[in-house]
């Protein structure tokens, strides 16, 4: 099992990144809340991974901290929640925000996440509330920030919007929903990561 990768960040194609370790490039699926905190392209990154083996694929899911990975593993234990939905949940909100929603039984916020209906939201609360006691205390997760993403490479607006749309669709949002969210938050000069961040905020 691959549990940790340390290497050079080669690409950010949200919600996927490419990290090179010992001359080998690993494709890793990451929640947007974690991608925002990554270093610049070309710099060293440390990713804690969860390895999933399916009949048709072998997938790596990555996180910036051991605690974020642990939360992801708890989320996908819930009945009816797989890795793809777990990724979408932790992209729509930070780990701390998710823990708070579960603790407060905030169903109305959880159902705004892609693929999460009322029954799934209720199941998450019922199954996870006791398991997550104490998780919201202290600095267990990557601190949430409203600052711009660290990658300041200029991006052509149209390309940024296309990349943002692709990321939202990969996370499970419907095309009309994704298009509307991106259009509403788009501003001149925004990078694709900024667009994704603001679009996700507008839908939660």
UniProtKB/Swiss-Prot annotation:
Family annotation (SUPFAM superfamilies): DNA helicase RuvA subunit, C-terminal domain, Nucleic acid-binding proteins, RuvA domain 2-like
Region described as Domain III: spans on this chain: 156-204
Any single biological process term in GO: SOS response
Residue ranges, annotated region (Flexible linker): 144-155
Region (Domain II): 65-143
UniProt cross-references to Pfam families, sorted A to Z: HHH_5, RuvA_C, RuvA_N
Membrane among keywords: no
Cellular localisation: Cytoplasm
Organism domain of life: Bacteria
Keyword rRNA processing: no
SMART domains, A to Z: HhH1
Location of the region described as Domain I in the Swiss-Prot/TrEMBL record: 1-64
InterPro entries given in the database record: DNA_helicase_Holl-junc_RuvA_I, Hlx-hairpin-Hlx_DNA-bd_motif, NA-bd_OB-fold, RuvA, RuvA_2-like, RuvA_C, RuvA_C_sf
A GO molecular-function descriptor: four-way junction DNA binding
Keywords: Cytoplasm, DNA damage, DNA recombination, DNA repair, DNA-binding
Job description of the protein: The RuvA-RuvB-RuvC complex processes Holliday junction (HJ) DNA during genetic recombination and DNA repair, while the RuvA-RuvB complex plays an important role in the rescue of blocked DNA replication forks via replication fork reversal (RFR). RuvA specifically binds to HJ cruciform DNA, conferring on it an open structure. The RuvB hexamer acts as an ATP-dependent pump, pulling dsDNA into and through the RuvAB complex. HJ branch migration allows RuvC to scan DNA until it finds its consensus sequence, where it cleaves and resolves the cruciform DNA.
Subunit: Homotetramer. Forms an RuvA(8)-RuvB(12)-Holliday junction (HJ) complex. HJ DNA is sandwiched between 2 RuvA tetramers; dsDNA enters through RuvA and exits via RuvB. An RuvB hexamer assembles on each DNA strand where it exits the tetramer. Each RuvB hexamer is contacted by two RuvA subunits (via domain III) on 2 adjacent RuvB subunits; this complex drives branch migration. In the full resolvosome a probable DNA-RuvA(4)-RuvB(12)-RuvC(2) complex forms which resolves the HJ.
Family stated for the protein in its record: Belongs to the RuvA family.
Domain notes: Has three domains with a flexible linker between the domains II and III and assumes an 'L' shape. Domain III is highly mobile and contacts RuvB.
Matching NCBIfam families: ruvA
Name this polypeptide is given: Holliday junction branch migration complex subunit RuvA
Species per Swiss-Prot/TrEMBL record: Vibrio cholerae serotype O1 (strain ATCC 39315 / El Tor Inaba N16961)
Source taxonomy: Bacteria, Pseudomonadati, Pseudomonadota, Gammaproteobacteria, Vibrionales
């Amino acid at each position: 099992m691959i549990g940790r990768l340390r290497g050079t960040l080669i690409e950010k194609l949200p919600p996927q990144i490419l990290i090179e370790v010992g001359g080998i490039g690993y494709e890793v699926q990451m929640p947007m809340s974690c991608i925002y905190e990554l270093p610049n392209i070309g710099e060293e990154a440390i990713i804690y991974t969860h390895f999933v083996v399916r009949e048709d694929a072998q997938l790596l899911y990555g996180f910036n901290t051991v605690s974020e990975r642990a939360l992801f593993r708890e989320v996908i234990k819930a009945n009816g929640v797989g890795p793809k939905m777990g990724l979408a949940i932790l992209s729509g909100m930070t780990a701390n925000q998710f823990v708070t929603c579960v603790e407060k039984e905030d169903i109305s916020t959880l159902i705004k996440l892609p693929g999460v209906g009322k029954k799934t939201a209720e199941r998450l609360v019922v199954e996870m509330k006791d398991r997550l006691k104490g998780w919201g205390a202290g600095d267990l997760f990557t601190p949430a920030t409203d600052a711009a993403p660290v990658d300041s490479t200029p991006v052509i607006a149209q390309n940024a919007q296309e990349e943002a749309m692709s990321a939202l669709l990969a996370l499970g949002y419907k095309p009309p929903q994704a298009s509307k969210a991106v259009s509403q938050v788009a501003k001149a000069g925004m990078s694709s990561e900024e667009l994704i961040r603001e679009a996700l905020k507008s839908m939660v």
